[in-house]
Each structure stands twice: as C-alpha cells, then as structure tokens.
A protein has these predicted regions:
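Soluble ligand-binding/transfer domains with enclosed cavities or grooves
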Residues: 2-219
C-alpha cells in the first residue's frame, strides 16, 4: 500500500527530520500516487470525516532543506503568533489542528514550553490558539478557504496565568488575545482516511497529520 510505504519513509527520517536526496524524491512520488487512493476524495462534502483534533507529524515547505523540521524545536513566541506577541524564546512541543462544523472552526493549536527557569516555579507550559473559520470552494471539493481572525495565549498543564506571563516576559495587564486580519489562505486535503490526512497549502506547505484521540482544546 502506498500509505504504508509513505509512513515507513517518514519513520526513516534522520534525527533532524531530514531526508536524503533519494528519500525526498521518493516522498514526492508517493504523495502524488496516494492522491488517487483517498477513501474520501471530496472532504468538504464529508465534513464529519474531517472534523476533530489532528496532530501534525510532518511538514515541508517546498524543498528538501525545509522538509521535516523536528516536531519539537526551539522558536519564538513572535514567530509562532505571526508577530502578534513579543519574541520570547519558546520550545514548540507539537502542533495540532482542530476543525468543527460548528461555526466552521478551523483552528491551529501550538503547544509550547518556556525555557527552564523562566517561571518562578520552573518550566511554564502554554498553548497558542490561532482561530480561524473555513468555507468550501464550489469549484474544488478538496479546498478549505480559511480566514484566520484571532490569536490567543492560554496556560496549560497546571501552569498559572501569572507564571505564563512571567515566563514570556508579559506585563500583568498585557492582553492574551490579539485580533488579526491576514490575507485569506486555502488548504487542499488531497488525501483523507480515518487515520491520516495530507494537506497542501496555498503558500506551498505540505502537511501530514494523524487523527488524535484527545478532545479538542479550542472548540
């Protein structure tokens, strides 16, 4: 099965999430082949198969050098929040996507931790919620047209709001919500089954996500 070969190839990535030249070429071939095997080839017409919480297990942005960044990696709050919050150092622990027919929600949830010692009580944990809504494209049943509208910060895993603020260098009265008006983007679900889906974004990203058994955080 193409799906089994694709997942096995992803398991062979090196410690930094990188491909060999041969592996990257093979990855592209398998993605093209798996498109025609999708059990649910028109996702916007079978939304019950799309909604829920999905965890990103692989992403690349148009070239081998940008393929497969390790899921756990160092970043900044500004980078992950589209510059809506300050450039505090954080460690991205995972990125999930949560979709619901209720309100046409299309949210990205980034779980992160602040550096050890940044909080009075040790490491602080939080989530960045990028809230968006989707609509379908009448001419393309794979396409979700998405408009992201708001960015939120929330403490998680027992971290208090004051500790999260302290860890990120935020003032006590600094807002944890920021509205946004970015250009609309779209994402094509080119493969969908009960376990995985593959998305190709309008700005060139390709993402493989696995369905999570956890309850959504943002919905």
């Amino acid at each position: 099965m193409v799906k089994d070969e694709l997942l096995a190839l992803l398991d062979s990535l090196d410690a930094n999430g990188g491909f060999t030249d041969e592996g990257f070429a093979r990855f592209g071939e398998l993605v093209e082949r798996i498109r025609i095997e999708s059990p649910w080839p028109e996702p916007t017409r079978t939304l019950h198969k799309v909604e829920g919480r999905w965890e990103t297990v692989f992403a690349h942005f148009g070239g081998k050098v940008n393929a497969g960044k390790t899921r756990v990696h160092d970043s900044t709050l500004a980078l992950q929040s589209w510059n809506r919050f300050p450039p505090a150092p954080i460690r991205v622990e995972r990125i999930c996507q949560e979709i619901s027919r209720q309100g046409n929600a299309y949210n990205n949830v980034i779980d992160f931790s602040a550096p050890p010692g940044a909080s009075r009580d040790g490491q602080a944990h939080g989530a960045i919620v990028v809230r968006g809504t989707f609509r379908d494209d009448p001419d393309n049943a794979q396409r979700f047209v998405v408009e992201f509208t708001r960015m939120e910060l929330a403490p998680t895993r027992g971290t208090s709001e004051p500790d999260l603020r302290r860890a990120l260098g935020l003032a006590d009265d600094a807002p944890l919500v920021a509205d946004m008006k970015p250009p609309k983007v779209s994402s094509d679900v080119i493969y969908l089954d009960d376990e995985i889906r593959i998305n190709v974004g309008s700005v060139g990203g390709l993402y493989l996500l696995k369905r999570s058994g956890e309850q959504p955080f943002s919905i």
